[in-house]
Amino acid sequence: GKDTEGQTGTLAKKYNARKVMIVYGGGSIIRSGLLQRIEESLQQAGVEYVKLGGIQPNPTDPKVYEGIELARKEGVDFMLPVGGGSVIDTAKAIAAGVPYEGDFWDFYIGKAKVKKALKVGVVLTIPAAGSEGSGNTVITKLEGLQKLSLRVPELLRPVFAVMNPELTYTLPPYQTACGIADMMVHIMER
């Protein structure tokens, strides 16, 4: 609902988050003030954070590797994607990769199973793929252009999803239409 992003810190704290990684795409969450509101909410709840920006549509493995490295270095224990499906999928892949000693891609090719993952909470800014409510993630490996999915609902489904409809009001009509088409395709696939 309205202004629910202000509860992000409290929600993360409820799931024992001590240090969060905020994952996001471009600059719209900065320009709109959303990132600042989320940072303030985390600070008020006493939750530390680091940021990983620049996630592109149809996310690729280099950002996942970067996120895993940053999370390990900084002691991150909770993932907080702010955006749509690509940002959420990247955060889920990082969440699975951080506690794993091998290559996170092992999960996607069936070489290993996810046995442990960081918790994920979401602040949704574009309705589309439904990643905020599923344990699925899709990543493209640039080498060989392999686009594969991973489904681990018991570990990768977000523990909360903040959905303030006002965060979608500034989306261009084309982007909203793309999101609606995405929803319909995902429903028909199931």
Where are these regions (language model features)?
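Gly/Ser/Thr-rich beta-alpha loop segments that engage phosphate groups in nucleotides
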Residues: 3, 27, 85-87, 130-132
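A glycine/threonine-rich phosphate-anchoring loop and its flanking beta-alpha core
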Residues: 99-190
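Conserved beta-strand elements of the Class I
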Residues: 21-22, 78-80, 121
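An N-terminal, well-structured beta->alpha segment
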Residues: 1-52
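Conserved active-site and cofactor/substrate-binding residues in soluble primary-metabolism enzymes
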Residues: 3, 7, 15, 33, ...
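Local beta-strand N-terminus motif with an aromatic residue
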Residues: 17-20, 76, 158
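N-terminal small/polar loop signature for handling phosphorylated ligands or for N-terminal nucleophile
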Residues: 30-102
